[in-house]
A protein has these predicted regions:
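A structural motif
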Residues: 9-11
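AMP-binding/adenylate-forming catalytic core of the ANL superfamily
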Residues: 13, 18-19, 29, 40-130
Length: 184
């Protein structure tokens, strides 16, 4: 690719694995027939320097627009009530088959009015900073899932969100989101 153009990063060389042990199907997805490893990372290059921008599986695509979840999380974490590492963002399919952005924020505030104000403010910031309507939900402290290395797990948070709201009917969540957007 030309400088400044993003793409999926592939590697090949003597130190690159030849496959996953006893997992031929996973190996065939990760490695092509010429031995190139698909890292799952997206990046760009400028003057021979590679910059990794994020994981392909974490990328949020809304109406054909690529949005990095860490950009949304950074905006949320800039608010005084939100600590660094207390926000996670991902997308889910809505009842019309479109992708809907979700932002989960660990919140220590107990006052209902202050919590509601924070949700409204974060929603407005996503619209202002990113031109994006985002379903914001406050969750209890220390409730967001983490990986074995201690980082927030977007994939697990997404699965937990879907599982939690399936009983409530995920369609009701997307309808609530549409009503919030309409009243904003």
């Amino acid at each position: 690719l030309d400088d400044w153009h993003s793409g999926v990063i592939h590697l090949r060389g003597p130190s690159v694995m030849s496959g996953y042990f006893n997992l031929p199907e996973e190996s065939s997805h990760a490695l092509d027939e010429d031995g190139w490893l698909n890292t799952g990372d997206i990046g760009y290059q400028v003057d021979g320097v590679l910059t990794i921008t994020g994981r392909k599986k974490d990328l949020i695509i809304i109406h054909g627009r690529n949005i990095w979840p860490q950009d949304l999380e950074h905006i949320a974490e800039a608010e005084p009530e939100v600590r660094s590492g207390d926000a996670v963002s991902f997308s889910i399919p809505d009842h019309e088959g479109e992708e809907m952005c979700v932002l989960l924020v660990q919140c220590r505030e107990t006052d209902p009015q202050k919590r509601n104000n924070l949700v409204r403010r974060l929603s407005a910031l996503m619209r202002l900073e990113m031109s994006l309507d985002c379903f914001v939900e406050l969750v209890p402290p220390r409730s967001l899932p983490k990986t074995s290395s201690g980082k927030l797990s977007r994939a697990k948070a997404r699965l937990d969100f879907i599982a939690t709201h399936e009983d409530d009917n995920l369609n009701a969540v997307t309808e609530e989101f549409r009503l919030r957007v309409a009243s904003a």
